[in-house]
Amino acid sequence: MNTWITAKIIKIKKWKNNLFSVIVNAPISPFTAGQFTKLGYQKKNGKIIQRAYSFVNAPHEKNLEFYMVLIKNGQLTTKLYNLNNTDHIQIKKKSYGFFTLNEIPTCKILWMFATGTGIGPYLSMLKYQKNTEKFQKIVLIHAVRYRHDLTYFNEINNLKNIYNKKLYTQFIISREKTNFSLSGRIPQLLKTEELEKHINLFIENNTSHVMLCGNPDMVKQTQNFLINNKNMKKHLRRKPGQISSENYW
């Protein structure tokens, strides 16, 4: 049975555009980078409001970090957003999910596509580093609406330095232009080949594995493009393929 345990709020980091990070400390069971858990807030009537969130922190780090967006009239996010370091919430003892690097076959290039808060699992994986040796190159792509939505911009650049030339990073911003990002949306930039040409690496079914995390529309459209245009298949334990995905709502 997966029980609820108490987590102490360490810090609520409030970013721009209603984005925030919840940092807690709790004696959870060991988890695998890329997994998610459930956070809960207990109401006065004893009922727990709960939602699933992926870990941003690596498994070896002391505190647990979760990245989310404040939802207007959202039952849980409005509670979490207004907590401070004297408060406590509930967290599941054990974690969930198979969106992890140990589930990905060895290949030449691993592509990590994320929109918005879907960047979280990749940060956990890359900080932990375990199983990254299975790939010659890793490409991390983070797509957002505005530059202020790139909450972990500095952390991503630090990871790029740690991995040296093994990690490629690319930011995509859809609603404003910058001198460091591509403009548009992931599916369209794949269709035009602008993304691959800009990075100078190419998605091929015999060399690449693609991970998709975030907006369900992005996941669906990108997955369909890869299946129809790159001759790729969904990756299943019983039937290996080249596409792994996780929807974020």
Curated annotation (Swiss-Prot):
Q: Which CDD domains match?
A: FNR1 (cd06195)
Give the record's keywords alphabetically: Cytoplasm, FAD, Flavoprotein, NADP, Nucleotide-binding, Oxidoreductase
The residues covered by the FAD-binding FR-type domain are 2-102
Pfam families to which the protein is assigned, alphabetical: FAD_binding_6 (PF00970), NAD_binding_1 (PF00175)
Q: Name one GO biological process term.
A: cellular response to oxidative stress
Q: What is its EC number?
A: 1.18.1.2, 1.19.1.1
Record GO terms (molecular function): ferredoxin-NADP+ reductase activity; nucleotide binding
Instruction: Answer yes or no on keyword Flavoprotein.
Output: yes
**Can you name a GO cellular component term?**
cytoplasm
- Look at the named UniProt entry and state the broad enzyme category this protein falls under: oxidoreductase
Q: Where does NADP(+) bind?
A: V144, R145, S174, R175, R185, N215, P216, D217
Location of the protein in the cell = Cytoplasm
Which domain of life, per UniProt?
Answer: Bacteria
Give the Gene3D superfamilies listed for this entry: Nucleotide-binding domain of ferredoxin-NADP reductase (FNR) module, Translation factors
Instruction: Return the similarity comment.
Output: Belongs to the ferredoxin--NADP reductase type 1 family.
Q: What does this protein do?
A: Transports electrons between flavodoxin or ferredoxin and NADPH.
PANTHER family the record matches? FLAVODOXIN_FERREDOXIN--NADP REDUCTASE (PTHR47878:SF1), OXIDOREDUCTASE FAD/NAD(P)-BINDING DOMAIN PROTEIN (PTHR47878)
Protein name, per record: Flavodoxin/ferredoxin--NADP reductase
